[in-house]
Each structure stands twice: as structure tokens, then as C-alpha cells.
Amino acid sequence: VQLIVTTDYSSMIEAMRHGRLDLAYFGPLSYVLAKQKSEIEPFAAIRQKGKTTYQAVVIANTSAGIDRIEDIAGKDVAFGDKASTSSHLIPKSMLAEKKLYAGQNYREHFVGAHDAVAMSVQNGHAQAGGLSKPIFETLVSRGMIKPEKVKVIAESEPFPQYPWTMRSDLDPQLKQKIKSAFMEINDPAILKPFKAEGFGAVTDKDYDVVRNLGSLLKLDLSKF
């Protein structure tokens, strides 16, 4: 097994498209984008508290006078990677539901990663931001983000977890062995880095909710 670590989602999507990867661990949106360019299929996602879903949060600097999403009007908002589900697509849709649109009602800034979003808000470079709830909770528990400086003002509905994917043209027997291997993992030492109880099965249809978000925000996903 050869491990390839890419610098961002776009480079991983390209690696999958050119057949340099057999398996890949995508975010929900980056999977949808990769699926448009290559024949891949999701087969497993981490299971936490019995679920293969997770949430995003919208956070705010405690001194910015923001108590609810509507208060973000006129502010600077930090997002992560443009191809990120929970640090871009989901929080942006939460703002859009309150009639707040980037470039019209607030200024958006892409800072690259979830932790960078939280740090930008904590440091006051942005008054609000969006990221994964599990990642935010980890940053707080590690002491990197101070609750007295950053607060959660909204949580999203549940969305499908980051999928493990494989090339669709792999040998069918190999594909089944890979799926079975993931589903049978129960060693705490292996699961600890994933902060997971185990893995659950997922399918392409589970990610239609992400595609629908793209439509809601009038995003041309082919240009990502």
C-alpha cells in the first residue's frame, strides 16, 4: 500500500481523475466534485454515536456583537477550502437561509482549513466563520480555541460523513474485500485517529443532499 497525501481537495480530485489513486478519503463536497470527473464510488464513512452523519457550526468572535446569524450582516466571514462541505457549503447555505449572501451582505474570506477558520475568528481577522462541529470541538478541547473568545451561534442539520471512495473499475471481488475489511474494523487503536466507533456503509445517493446545497446556492460545481 502506498500512501499519498495531497495538499488540498483539488489536487486529490485530479489524482483520482488521472488514476493515480485506487482509494481516497474525500469530504462530502469534494467527493461530489470528484464524481463529476472520474468513475468512483463511496463505500464507507466513519460512525460516531451510531451515526454516519455530522454537523457544521457557524461561530462568532464573542466581542463582535453577533448572537445569531442575522447579526453577521456587514461582517467579515471566514470559510475554509472552497471545495469543503462543512467549512464552506453548509455554513454558506445557513447564511443564505437568513437572506445573507456573500458579496452582498457580508465579505467572505477563504483561509484554507477548518482550524484556520477558527483561529481567524478568535484573532478577530473575521467576525464569524463556518467549520465542522467535531473539528471545532476538538480545537476547544485541545485549548487552541478559547470559549471566552469564540462561541457557536448556530448548528446545521446532519449531513453525511466524509466518504471513503474507490475506483469503480477495480475488480469486483477486490472491492467487496475492501468494503468488508472496513466494516469489520473494531480495533480501538485503529479507530482512535478517526475518533470513530467503526465504519458504516454509504452510497452515492447519500450525497444528493450535498448536490442540492450546490443548487440552492446557485453554485456551478463544474467550475470548482
Regions found by a protein language model. Give the residues of each.
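Extracytoplasmic small-molecule ligand-binding "clamshell" domains
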Residues: 1-29
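Short helix-initiation/N-cap motifs at beta->coil->alpha
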Residues: 3-14, 102-119, 158
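Hydrophobic residues within well-ordered alpha-helices
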Residues: 16-17, 72, 121-122
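An extracytoplasmic/periplasmic, membrane-proximal ligand-sensing/linker region
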Residues: 159-161, 165-224
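Short beta-strand->loop
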Residues: 40-51, 106-107, 140-158
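Bilobed "Venus flytrap"/periplasmic-binding protein-like clamshell domains
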Residues: 29, 52-118, 126-128, 134
